[in-house]
A protein has these predicted regions:
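C-terminal extensions of enzymes
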Residues: 1-18, 26-35, 40-43, 146-152, ...
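Non-catalytic, usually N-terminal nucleic-acid engagement modules in DNA/RNA processing proteins
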Residues: 1-185, 299-302
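Conserved, mostly hydrophobic/aromatic
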Residues: 24, 57, 92, 134, ...
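A non-catalytic, amphipathic alpha-helix used as a structural packing/dimerization or gating element
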Residues: 129, 133, 160-171, 207, ...
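Generic secondary-structure signature for well-ordered alpha-helical cores
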Residues: 139, 170, 174-177, 243-246, ...
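Glycine- and acidic
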Residues: 151-155, 159, 219-225, 334-337
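Glycine-rich phosphate/ribose-binding loops and adjacent secondary-structure elements
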Residues: 166, 175, 179, 187-308
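Surface-exposed helix-capping loop/turn segments at secondary-structure junctions
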Residues: 175-185, 249, 355-367
Length: 378
């Protein structure tokens, strides 16, 4: 396997790197903008994403499999052509949705039987099916099919689940290699990331990290966090796992998180992030600023002539006032959501740019502390 990830600079444990993909080079640390159904909720287009500095878009295997179906996407030339996005795309494996959305599910060695959350139809998904769907989607990076273990879970259950996730990963790798060698595969250079699981048990996490590292995959994710555990537990697990993952591969913390979480995780050696929070919060008028979070629904913004954030260069802040955007929300105008989602994603993407600059300059710790102070609720 050719070397894709280059560690350019370390500042403490914080890593500044670049990851070469068939769809462009990713500068890390990076925040992936979540477009579950191949679009960001809030009427944000792929052209908008480029304007606000998005490097990587993340789409959801489970949802796209159900609608419009991965076969439709494949017939349309893969996700990149389908959504008109020529930069990297990561698809998750569908595992998290199978376990979180489906009340009716049976986990077997071969995979998971579950009911569609749309129409109740019985569906089966295992490692091979997840790889086949992601190959049809033709994403840049495919995630391995795993069980996202609920928190809390007993030690015995976690041990059994992690062992099965390892066996599933082996099957994912074999199937991915097979698919990438086929003549009719859209993206023959599709990459595979493995996922570390183990709940809040450090020793299980470490043993699993060592096991999956032997498979020499393109990257490694820490999964099963941000599912109800405390921030202290999350940081403890990251501290335990990162030293046992390869230094020459990217490390991805799945589903995390708040700007504060990102600063802390970067300080612990994490490279990739994704979270629905910026878009979801934006759709409800909750916006991130250089001075912390604001709720634009608040009556105090009714006559506020300032932009959302006076230091921000996003499309919303360059052209509109807090008063106007608040009015749009009260009038239930779709533009309100669009402007706030654009602002929040720009805020996250800009934060990652500043993080990379701080690591490059060797002042990441000072940068982190300064940001955390600025964001304290005033």
């Amino acid at each position: 396997m050719s070397k894709r990830y280059t560690l350019l600079k370390k500042d403490g444990k914080a890593r500044r790197g670049q990851f070469v993909t068939p769809h462009g080079t990713i500068q890390t640390p990076v925040f992936m903008n979540v477009g579950t159904l191949a679009a960001i909720k809030g009427a944000v287009s792929s052209m908008d994403l480029k304007e606000i500095g998005c490097q990587v878009e993340l789409s959801n295997t489970y949802h796209l499999h159900l609608r419009p179906s991965d076969k439709v996407v494949a017939k349309m030339g893969g996700l990149h052509k389908f959504m008109n996005w020529d930069r990297p795309i990561l698809t998750d494996s569908g595992g998290f949705q199978v376990f979180s959305l489906s009340a009716m599910r049976k986990i077997k060695e071969e995979g998971v039987y579950f009911n569609s959350h749309i129409d109740g139809k019985k569906i089966f998904m295992g490692p091979e099916e997840s790889m086949q769907i992601q190959s049809n989607l033709a994403s840049t990076i495919a995630m391995a099919f795993d069980e996202c273990i609920p928190n809390p879970s007993t030690r015995e259950y976690v041990e059994r689940s992690v062992a099965r996730t390892t066996r599933w990963l082996e099957r994912c790798k074999i199937e991915m290699d097979r698919l990438n060698s086929k003549d009719d595969t859209i993206n023959k250079e599709q990459m595979l990331f493995g996922i570390n699981q183990g709940g809040v048990y450090e020793d299980i996490r470490i043993a699993h990290a060592k096991e999956i590292t032997k498979m020499d995959l393109d990257g490694y994710a820490i999964g099963g966090l941000a599912v109800g555990e405390s921030h202290e537990d999350m940081y403890r697990i990251i501290d335990a796992v990162v030293p046992h993952l390869p230094e020459d591969k990217p490390i991805y913390l799945m589903g995390v998180g708040t700007p504060e979480n990102i600063l802390e995780a970067v300080d612990r050696g994490v490279d990739f992030f994704d979270c629905v929070l910026p878009a979801r919060n934006g759709r409800h008028g909750n916006v991130y600023t250089s001075e912390g979070k604001l709720n634009l629904m608040n009556a105090k913004f009714e006559l506020d002539e300032k932009p959302i954030d006076e230091t921000c260069q996003c499309p919303a802040c360059k052209h509109y006032t807090r008063s106007y955007i608040r009015h749009l929300f009260k009038a239930k105008e779709m533009l309100a959501m669009r402007l706030c989602v654009l602002h929040n994603l720009y805020f996250y993407n800009k934060l990652m740019e500043e993080i990379r600059t701080a690591i490059d300059g060797g002042y990441y710790k000072e940068f982190k502390e300064k940001k955390l102070q600025e964001w304290k609720v005033k």
